[in-house]
Design a protein with these regions (language model features):
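Glycine-centered loop-to-beta-strand initiation motif
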Residues: 638-648
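Catalytic cores of nucleophile-dependent amide-cleaving enzymes
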Residues: 321, 325-362, 446-536
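Extracellular pro-sequences of secreted precursors
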Residues: 10-270, 277-301
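Surface beta-strand/loop "capping" patches
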Residues: 590-620
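Active-site-adjacent structural elements in enzyme catalytic domains
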Residues: 146, 159-163, 168-174, 182-184, ...
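Short, aromatic- and glycine-rich surface loops/edge beta-strands on solvent-exposed regions
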Residues: 654-664
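Active-site-proximal C-terminal subdomain of hydrolase catalytic domains
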Residues: 309, 380, 480-595, 599
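Edge beta-strands of extracellular beta-sandwich domains
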Residues: 665-676
Length: 676
């Protein structure tokens, strides 16, 4: 049966007057001897809101606070919790010591609450199926106050150079018999990390830190002692390709080299078939990652050039889908990716060539008319139970905070579906005109967005030559790429049309998790008939923050940021989400969000074979690649003062060197240096 919250009446609110703010914050950092690091934190709760809800099991009251999320076992009373991801040094044991807190008991009847606290429900799938209402009666007959442990921290694994832990604070306990709660407020506690191996922690940062992951690092609470700073690291790019695609990929490999990537290509025929293939390729990637060299740093990106028949994916561990995740999850024992991945999914050259051509045209800014980059198409599809509470605010959040005229966008085609199959022709027409970004959230199928419908046939007839968007489908199974051609693959395979990237799921996605994926973790209040978006200051970061605040985060990075929002939550589907979301397209490509601006770049226009470095003046943070004869001579990021000395190696005796400078939302600069 579908969970329907009907007849909603706001019962009241409880102001916690002695609260010292609301939410979680870091108070201080301390480093001691014997590898000890202590981070003192506080958690306060200033207000609780209540509203009544009718369910198949009778009347309940939902209790929530905007800065907090929902915790508890499914079917048991849903109580506020707050969660964070924290970096932990390698080798350290860690624990929490609670130093102080205030407590206050409240009779909920005094605040208009006369029914039981609403039982926590799992998120509903986006496949249109009915979600059963879960109610564990045994959780409502206990005497005394019950709830989650006040503080909890657990190791969740390693992402790139960061060992991560998940912190949960549960400040409310509930007595269902007496209809009372206890609030633990102004909690001060310490996260104590002992016996840290700081040498290994520094070495992991030195060997594995990558600008491709810099935005993800900002989503984590990092102790001061672990803030080693950014490195001017050359980025590394691995391509795993079917051997039949070698010649077609040559211009793509040359361009990535010119941009400043250390590119390595490995061909799929050396890894066998079936399970032997996935095991062999994973071992190859793991070895490359775990044994970085100056010539080949640990790869930041892996591109699979071939479909699932040519480069098989893994079987998912959480359901019956396939997944590329375990090629990227290098660290044993966890499911967090250490590399950003994407696919040029193709069974033959006719499917591969458009993906290469569109990517090169896009990255080189070879548009006849770039004005389409000012345009966006946003669609909240239809579902009678979830569109208004989840789909509408998802889209409205993007418009309110990022995709608007104040940020330079001009034509923002927005469709908030209030019924089935609305505006289908208009949506297709808007995409056909050209857009920099397209986002759909609702139901999907392996061959379409479901409602409003947008099918593979629509993609193939768009005719949006030279006006290719980056597309995200927050919906079910549009990247079910074990099929001959799924919806996500079609966007990339379309010749002279389609998209330069598509992010979607290889299995069912879910309403709550997709909402967090896009806008960041927050309390979802349902119903929300007007689709009011959450306040930005009340949410954690999600994919939209990575897009617009990530300073050049790649398309694969957007996907990772969305999954990290789910990882921070109390969802039971974290590993599942890492498994199902995939990028079709180049993982290093960075979407132009609005028309980019030209950069001012200067350098000496002549060198010789004995030259060991070239000074380049360019915008701070831009990336400089210098190459000759499709060989990388040197690459570096421009310093804050607007210049960088790019160290060179193996300069040829004569000819020309190519200088390529790229930056976030900037037109790429391409110039030449004479070699005398």
């Amino acid at each position: 049966m579908m969970v329907m919250l009907t007849g909603v009446v706001f019962a009241g609110e409880l102001e916690l007057k002695d609260a010292k703010g609301s939410g979680l914050k870091v108070i201080s950092h301390k480093t001691g001897g014997q590898g000890e690091i202590t981070m003192r934190m506080s958690c306060s709760l200033d207000k609780l809101y209540f509203y009544d809800a009718e369910t198949p099991k009778g009347s309940f009251t939902v209790m929530y606070s905007p800065e907090f999320f929902f915790g508890g076992e499914y079917g048991a009373p849903q109580l506020p919790v707050i969660t964070k991801l924290i970096q932990i040094p390698f080798g350290a044991n860690f624990r929490i010591e609670v130093k102080s807190y205030d407590t206050q008991e409240y009779n909920l009847a005094d605040y208009g609450v006369s029914t039981r606290i609403f039982p926590r429900q799992p998120s509903a799938p986006k496949d249109g199926s009915e979600a059963p209402f879960i109610y564990e009666q045994s959780a409502y007959v206990f005497k005394g106050f019950h709830g989650q442990q006040l503080t909890n921290i657990k190791d969740i694994g390693v992402m790139r150079h960061m060992r991560l832990a998940h912190l949960t604070i549960a400040p409310v306990k509930y007595n269902p018999i007496d209809n009372k709660i206890i609030v633990y407020n102004n909690i001060e506690f310490e996260v104590i990390m002992e016996n840290a191996d700081m040498n290994k922690t520094r070495a992991e940062h030195e060997n594995l830190w990558s600008p491709a992951f810099s935005w993800m690092e900002s989503l984590v609470v990092v102790p001061e002692a672990l803030r080693f700073g950014e490195r001017n690291a050359v980025q590394s790019y691995l391509i795993v390709a079917d051997p039949a695609f070698k010649d077609a990929l040559a211009p793509f490999v040359a361009w990535k080299t010119q941009k400043g990537f250390k590119v390595q290509v490995v061909y799929a025929d050396q890894f066998g078939t079936g399970a032997a293939f996935t095991a062999g390729l994973k071992e190859y990637i793991d070895n490359l990652y775990n044994n970085p060299t100056a010539d080949m740093p640990a790869p930041s990106y892996v591109l699979f050039a071939g479909d699932n028949e040519k480069i098989p994916a893994f079987k998912g561990q959480t359901n019956t889908h396939i997944t590329d995740l375990y090629y990227a999850a290098v660290t044993p024992g966890d499911f967090l990716p250490d590399i950003l991945t994407g696919r040029f999914s193709a069974s033959d050259l006719s499917q591969l060539q458009p993906q290469i051509d569109k990517t090169l045209e896009y990255e080189k800014f070879q548009f006849a008319d770039p004005s389409f980059l000012d345009d966006v198409v946003l669609v909240a599809g239809w579902d009678g139970s979830w569109a208004r509470s989840h789909g509408w605010p998802h889209i409205n959040y993007a418009k309110k905070y990022y995709i608007n005229e104040e940020n330079g966008f001009k034509n923002i085609a927005t469709y908030l579906s209030a019924g089935s199959h609305q505006n289908e022709a208009k949506i297709v027409a808007d995409v056909a005109k050209g857009a920099c970004y397209v986002n759909y959230t609702a139901h999907g199928s392996p061959t379409s967005w479901a409602d409003p419908s947008f099918s593979i046939n629509n993609i193939m007839s768009l005719g949006n030559k030279g006006k290719y968007p980056f597309v995200i489908g927050n919906c079910c199974i549009t990247n079910k790429f074990e099929l001959p051609q799924c919806f996500g693959e079609a966007w990339l395979r379309a010749k002279d049309g389609g998209a330069i990237g598509y992010v979607g799921a290889s299995n069912n996605s879910y309403w709550d998790e997709d909402f967090w994926w896009g806008v960041g973790l927050h309390s979802i209040v349902k119903p929300n008939n007007d689709g009011v978006p959450p306040l930005k200051e009340k949410t954690g970061p999600g994919a939209f923050e990575a897009m617009f605040e990530g300073n050049g985060t790649s398309n694969a990075g957007f996907m990772m940021a969305g999954n990290l929002a789910v990882e921070q939550s109390s969802s039971s589907r974290k590993q599942y989400y890492w498994e199902i979301y995939h990028l079709m397209g180049d993982p290093s490509l960075k979407t132009f969000m609005g028309q980019p601006k030209a950069m001012r770049v200067s350098f000496d226009n002549e060198i010789n074979a004995r030259t060991t470095s070239v000074k380049v003046n360019a915008p701070a943070g831009s990336y400089v690649g210098i190459s000759a004869n499709d060989t990388l001579l040197g690459a570096a990021y421009v310093d804050a003062d607007g210049s960088v000395d790019v160290n060179l190696s193996s300069v040829p005796a004569n000819g020309e060197a190519m200088v390529v400078v790229t930056a976030a939302n900037a037109i790429p600069f391409m110039g030449k240096i004479n070699i005398r």
